[in-house]
Amino acid sequence: FIGIGSAPEFLDRLIWQKLKNNEKKLFLKKKFYMLKSDGYEYKIKLAFLKDGRKNKVLNKKINSKIPVFLIHGKKDDVVPLKLSRKIFSIFPRAKKKMEIVKGGDHSLSRKGDLNRLANLINKVIY
């Protein structure tokens, strides 16, 4: 398993819980919410939110021994680093490694970040 700035349950944890009550009411009424992030707008449908609630994983244990590699930017302001740490806890039997990228943001799109990602993927595949 490779997680890059992983955000399971992001609809609830990173969107719904941060909305004000009036925004939640409007979301429920219109059946969608226009999320603004980093200069972009994303249409989040209510059906997507409800589907995400059916697929929660952070309250379970995954007893697989598959290797778990997580990489997370230290300056990620979209997904908190504590979420990657929480992911670690759901894999009690796995061999785990987390790399925190100094200066890395959520996209990890600097050339050095992309090289680091490519090297990690190559290690897992080969």
Regions found by a protein language model. Give the residues of each.
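Hydrolase active-site cap/lid region
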Residues: 1-47
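Short beta-strand/loop motif that positions the catalytic acidic residue
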Residues: 63-64, 70-72, 76
